[in-house]
């Protein structure tokens, strides 16, 4: 992550150490290990190991395909998870708020409220246009998304 973006993240998020799986912690180059405590299957089925949590190979292939750097990619298990993770990363519970313009995808509100983040709903004006004045009036230093 580039330092110029750090100011947008919650302090507690920046202080976290990246997750390391048991496979990374106990890596042994000399022999293949089966980590039964990680619920790995020692038998040769097609799904006998957990995938790489950092998705290094997948990001590398997508980056090559799209002609971008792999650190420009963020992958999630669908839009619900992505929205939740964005709110967790940027919004301080009980302090910050997000703004939504109904009708919109319901998970913005559900995720924000689940994590203790206030939701300000800004109604549309005629012909489903944004009310930019209302958005600007509702926005302040605690507006995050």
Give the role of each language-model region.
Residues 31-33, 70, 94-95, 142-143:
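A general structural motif
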Residues 118-124:
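Short beta-strand->loop structural element characteristic of the AMP-binding/adenylate-forming
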Residues 1-64, 145:
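N-terminal "arm"/small-domain region of PLP-dependent enzymes with the aminotransferase-like
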Residues 89-111, 125:
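Conserved PLP-anchoring active-site segment centered on the Schiff-base-forming lysine
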Residues 39-42, 79, 105:
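Short glycine-rich anion-binding loops that position phosphate/pyrophosphate groups of nucleotides
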Residues 59-97, 115:
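Phosphate-binding glycine-rich loop
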Residues 126-145:
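Active-site phosphate-binding strand-loop segment of PLP-dependent enzymes
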